Amino acid sequence: MELLVKNKEGRLWDISGMVSDLAWKTSRSGKPATLELTLVDSGIYQHPKFDISNGDIVQFSKDGLDVFYGFVFSMDTGSDQLIKLTAYDQIRYLLGNGSYVLQDVTAQEVIRKIAKDYGLKTGVLEETLYHIPSLIEDDKKLLDIIMGALGSELQYKGQLMAFYDDFGKLTLRKPASMLLNLVLGAGHSLYDYSLKKSIDQDTYNTIFLYQDNEQTGKREFYPVSDKGNVERWGLLHLYQKADDKANAAQIQEQAGQLLRLHNREKLSLSVQAIGDLRVRAGNFIYVLLDEFQTQLFLVDTCSHKINGGEHTMSLDIKVV
């Protein structure tokens, strides 16, 4: 394990030997990745030139894998002689607000534009297909603007993109690029889990899209429904405005896409497993349990903990 700190004077310090506990946390939406370190006040910490300040760069690598590149945002010390550091990746700088008026842009282009405006580094930004006719956001969190654009990609093109910071570079990946060759299950690194099946949130068996016709002055509806699931669960409907510039065929296609996304029972798992640093929020992994055959799950949140020689991870995962 390698943990490096680079301060504003350009000095590079290897603090690997000082770390007693490490936690690396990632989430699919709305949060930067977090690295939490507990340092023992000894060894290199006693060096007269050693210093850690807010804003310093922190790098974490292990077994040849570059895991985290971020910046110190808080430090806590106390009488126990332990120093606790919290660092965030570049996405932390997207939590500020901004205003944008953009026409005919893709989510990929929105990310590139915001990153350029705020001096953030980008890496691989894979192609998104949906062109947002008009994006108007006033005094809104930059990350929310990006996630909204990615939501349009999912809604209109059915493509669930992963947006994250990959060791210091904002990255956008298609689902196929996020698939890991990893199976969790009994005998496959998993040692505890809880399973939930629900139709209580984000499940709809009927979609009502509407569009106001300026010529006739009437509101036109485009319904699509799964009658079998309406009988099974009752009417669970989504009522939503369609794009003003979309034609009838496009609206009907969008309604069908929304039904395919939402017309199902939600299957989610909370998993405790032996740690594997390849796993982060946004990855797809395979899970094998007695309750079902091997199935592909999306990692919604992921928390790694390293304490001495022990490495575990806690995952919230779901079928999409």
Residue ranges and their predicted role:
Residues 1-2, 51-56, 155-157, 165-166, ...:
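A short, compositionally biased
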Residues 1-7, 58, 169-171, 206-212, ...:
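Short polybasic amphipathic segments
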Residues 1-93, 183-196:
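Assembly/oligomerization scaffold segments
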Residues 21-51, 188-320:
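An acidic/polar, Gly/Ser/Thr-rich interaction patch typically located in mid-to-C-terminal regions
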Residues 37, 72, 87, 99-123, ...:
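Amphipathic, non-transmembrane alpha-helical segments in extracytoplasmic/periplasmic proteins
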Residues 62, 174, 289-291:
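Conserved "cap/hinge" positions at secondary-structure junctions
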Residues 82-83, 89-90, 126-195:
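Short beta-strand-centered interaction patches in the first periplasmic/extracellular domains
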Residues 82-99, 310-320:
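Short solvent-exposed strand/turn elements
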